[in-house]
Amino acid sequence: MRNIQIALTKGRLEKHVIPLFEQIGIDCSELKNKGRKLVFQSKNTDISFILVKAVDVATYVEHGVADIGVVGKDILMENEKDIYEMLDLGVGVCKFCVASIPTYNPKSYRKKCIATKYPHITSNYFHNKGEDVEIIKIEGSVEIAPILGLADAIVDIVETGKTLQENGLIVFEEMYSISARMIVNKAALKTKKDEIFSIVNMMEQEILSGK
């Protein structure tokens, strides 16, 4: 088996995904005791892992540094990359939502101002609804934007809704459901077809058996 390099995102999604790899027989002991390391070798397979920021996973896969990547669908929707999306892993499930303070009127004909970390997704969503909105990109916590009057509402990923609730915001619209996806480099799918499909097929069977 030729070496397969897999890019994972650090943090919450990583914790959801590692058990899936372990369940298909890939040793992840180094990943679970990583310290400050960012590159790891599976002890029982020719598979190595790299840990990068979520927004960079698809970039590493697109450019062939990684053969396979696991990343949230939000990243793929916001940043169009020339890769194959192979599998919905069914973990890290969240929703894109429009949220604001209780006095927000989503049916108002007045041009709205929306704060978000995801301007591309937000623009497409409102365009498809036939609404012209002003979009302000914010890198940090967007919840404060409608509270301070910077924006009428926000578009953000909601998992439990606790953060919104703690800041006095409510969900007005549920836009899209998202989850972790397995992506593959296009060239690698030709040169390492058997190895990649072996991982994808085993992962798919594991997901189906767990439903």
From Swiss-Prot:
Alphabetically ordered keywords of this record: Amino-acid biosynthesis, ATP-binding, Cytoplasm, Glycosyltransferase, Histidine biosynthesis, Nucleotide-binding, Transferase
Signal peptide: none
Domain of life from the UniProt record: Bacteria
GO MF term set: ATP binding; ATP phosphoribosyltransferase activity
InterPro entries: ATP_PRibTrfase_cat, ATP_PRibTrfase_CS, ATP_PRibTrfase_HisG, ATP_PRibTrfase_HisG_short
Main subcellular location of this protein, as a coarse class: cytoplasm
GO CC terms of this entry: cytoplasm
Reaction it catalyzes: 1-(5-phospho-beta-D-ribosyl)-ATP + diphosphate = 5-phospho-alpha-D-ribose 1-diphosphate + ATP
Enzyme class: transferase
Pathway: Amino-acid biosynthesis; L-histidine biosynthesis; L-histidine from 5-phospho-alpha-D-ribose 1-diphosphate: step 1/9
Listed GO biological process terms: L-histidine biosynthetic process
Compartment(s): Cytoplasm
Enzyme Commission number, as recorded: 2.4.2.17
Entry annotated with the keyword Nucleotide-binding: yes
Family that this chain belongs to: Belongs to the ATP phosphoribosyltransferase family. Short subfamily.
Function of the molecule: Catalyzes the condensation of ATP and 5-phosphoribose 1-diphosphate to form N'-(5'-phosphoribosyl)-ATP (PR-ATP). Has a crucial role in the pathway because the rate of histidine biosynthesis seems to be controlled primarily by regulation of HisG enzymatic activity.
Listed PANTHER family: ATP PHOSPHORIBOSYLTRANSFERASE (PTHR21403:SF8), ATP PHOSPHORIBOSYLTRANSFERASE ATP-PRTASE (PTHR21403)
UniProt xrefs under NCBIfam families: hisG
Domain observations: Lacks the C-terminal regulatory region which is replaced by HisZ.
Protein name: ATP phosphoribosyltransferase
Organism (species): Bacillus cereus (strain AH820)
Classification of source organism: Bacteria, Bacillati, Bacillota, Bacilli, Bacillales
